[in-house]
Each structure stands twice: as structure tokens, then as C-alpha cells.
């Protein structure tokens, strides 16, 4: 019984800690409201991606997997071949649990081998499709602040008559140790497409 109680208390503390980080992030969002992130529209070419796709149960397990990949892959793949670390989020709505994600490294050149990093995980190369219209925003700070960039892109999409056209990507422009991640710089990339006149008119009518 004591072990069960201990586990329940530890779970409660983890959940409270996540909520606190969310509150702190929202406070910081309000502080940064007058210094809005710029949204840049660009086309992104097809890219080679050494990756694994999986369902991640919790933020803690996400960090563990990211650290594991970052700890193993640079010693198994030539550094001149590795591009930035990247992630793709396939989950439709923002959630802290059970996210469908793809994690790995963008590549400058092909690699041939399946790279096994544990009994559970192996990374394999594939090609990410080109995106003609990608809405992007660069965000610095911890990973919990990525939603600032997502929010800014969402505002741009709504204001300019676009819609989301695929899963969004996070590209690590500068990644510090994840235990002290305040200096991380991440580019959020959201595929978008312009709404046609009929769809936009129908949406306005529904409102």
C-alpha cells in the first residue's frame, strides 16, 4: 500500500510540475506579447530524414528519447552528413500525453544502414516531401515555449486566409542540454495552403 501511495504522489507531483511550467510559459507569453514573433513564409525542398516515428506517452519520455537519439547517432553517423535535429508532430491537437511524433536528424547525404539504438528503437532514412508554402517562426527558450511560435503562426493563418496543410515540424537551430534548455532556438514550420474563395465565404457565413 505504501508503494502504491508513493507512486500516486510521484505522479501527482509530475502533473503539478507540468501545470506549473505551462503557467510560467503563459506568463512569459503575456510578457512577450508586445514583441511578437515574425512569421516568415518560404518554400522548403525535399529533405533526407534519419528518423523513428512512435507514440510518446509523456513529456519526460519525449526528453529521454531525444537525449538517447542525440547521444547515439552522432557517434554512428559521420558528423559531416548530419544536419539539425528535427521532429514532426502528427497529433492533430496539442496534448502533453500520447503524442504521435517522428524524431531524428535531417541529412546532407544518404545513409544506407538501419541504425538500431535500443531493443525498442531503430532509425531509418526516408525523404521528407517538399513543401511549397511553409509558415515558419523561430522561438528561443525551453521546449514548453514552442506553443508561442505555434500561436503566432495560427494568428497569421487566420488573418491571411490560409489553412494548415500537414503536420508541423520543429527544427533545432541551436539545442543546448535539455536539462538547461532556456537557450534552445527552434524553428517551427507549418505547411499551409490558401483557402479558396468558396471555402472562405462558407466559413464566414457559418460564423
Residue ranges and their predicted role:
Residues 1-207:
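A solvent-exposed interaction/effector surface
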Amino acid at each position: 500500500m505504501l508503494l502504491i501511495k508513493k507512486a500516486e504522489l510521484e505522479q501527482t507531483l509530475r502533473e503539478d510540475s507540468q501545470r506549473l511550467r505551462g503557467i510560467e510559459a503563459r506568463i512569459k507569453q503575456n510578457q512577450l506579447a508586445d514583441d511578437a514573433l515574425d512569421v516568415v513564409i518560404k518554400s522548403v525542398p525535399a529533405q533526407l530524414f534519419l528518423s523513428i516515428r512512435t507514440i510518446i506517452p509523456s513529456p519526460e519520455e519525449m526528453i529521454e528519447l531525444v537525449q538517447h537519439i542525440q547521444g547515439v547517432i552522432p557517434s554512428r553517423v559521420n558528423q559531416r552528413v548530419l544536419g539539425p535535429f528535427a521532429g514532426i508532430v502528427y497529433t492533430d491537437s496539442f496534448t502533453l500525453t500520447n503524442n504521435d511524433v517522428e524524431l531524428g536528424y535531417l541529412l546532407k547525404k544518404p545513409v544506407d544502414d538501419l541504425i538500431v539504438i535500443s531493443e525498442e528503437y531503430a532509425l531509418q532514412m526516408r525523404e521528407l516531401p517538399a513543401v511549397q508554402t511553409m509558415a515558419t517562426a523561430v522561438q528561443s527558450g525551453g521546449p514548453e515555449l514552442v506553443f508561442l511560435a505555434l500561436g503566432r503562426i495560427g494568428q497569421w493563418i487566420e488573418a491571411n486566409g490560409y489553412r494548415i496543410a500537414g503536420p508541423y515540424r520543429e527544427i533545432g537551430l541551436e539545442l543546448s542540454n535539455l536539462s538547461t534548455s532556456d537557450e534552445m532556438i527552434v524553428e517551427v514550420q507549418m505547411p499551409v495552403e490558401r483557402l479558396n474563395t468558396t471555402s472562405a465565404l462558407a466559413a464566414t457565413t457559418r460564423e
